[in-house]
Amino acid sequence: MPRQKGARVLINTHILGTGAYAPKRVLTNQDLAALVDTSDAWITERTGIKQRRIAAEGEVTSDMAVIAARHALAMAGTKAEDLDMIIVATVSADMPLPSCAVIIQAKLGAARAFAFDVSAACAGSLYGLSIADQFVRTGKARRILVIGAELLSRLVDWTDRNTCVLFGDAAGAMVVGPAPDSERGLLSTHLHSDGTAAGILSIRGGGSQHPQSAEVLARKMDKITMNGREIYKFAVRVLPEAILEALSANGLEVSDIDHIVPHQANARIVESVLGRLGIPLEKCWMNLDRYGNTSSASLPISLDEANRADRLKPGDLIAMMAIGAGMTWGSALMRW
């Protein structure tokens, strides 16, 4: 049943289907040790990552997104031509123009859907889910495809051990629509940004400030640069606050959470945030060791794996959290 707010009817939003895709090629820590000055022990201790997936030559972001989307559509029992809207969270689109979303729309044959990209880095899927929620709640759309897809292996400097060990390629997708009943669905989403911290994680070249040039390429300004220590400090401060904000908005306690699905950037960050909240690690679905940091794909992939493993039961309270470059971050609560 829809919720009533004054004279306005609001519909509960639910995730009707999930899907994921990761390329076949596996790059292990031992493989990286042959490329840069690192070791399996060094990477594992600092990040929790054991391996990551790398896209094949000729494979692009939209290719991965389409496979994940088809899995999600199949689970939801939804045809691509019935989609009203496609939201794609990515910082590694096939090309600067047009959006990755319209390319995916064409590949899926989703002719009715309007499509656009969201650029919120690792928090992108959560931003996309929040946008989709507003359209479903107000009755503007009934079937929305939210995708997080990243091909980061082409954006890292493979001589920089501080970044090349972290990232992987993958895609995750969610089909969003009206909840089956009034007791289930998204309870709330909470988004934040702080542009004063933009410099701690960025790709400085390739935009209007530093257009693509021989100098940009020579200085590797087209690659990811980051200050890992500052990112850690920022994340462990704001993510617990975001989860508490969501709980407070719904009159709930930390102990009410059945599962927590985080963006997985670094095991230390996730473990520290859970520790500060008093949430046992057993309530968290972790796959960072197998995929690395897949940015916007991370959250929907984790949700899909937990869903397909039958870990999520009707009525379970699921907390989601993500943080990315910008800085951008947020949280969501959902009654599965």
What is the meaning of each model-derived region?
Residues 42-63, 90-144, 275-303:
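Conserved catalytic cysteine-centered active-site region
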Residues 68-84, 241-258, 306-311:
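Phosphate/pyrophosphate-binding loops at sites that engage ATP/ADP/AMP, CoA/4′-phosphopantetheine
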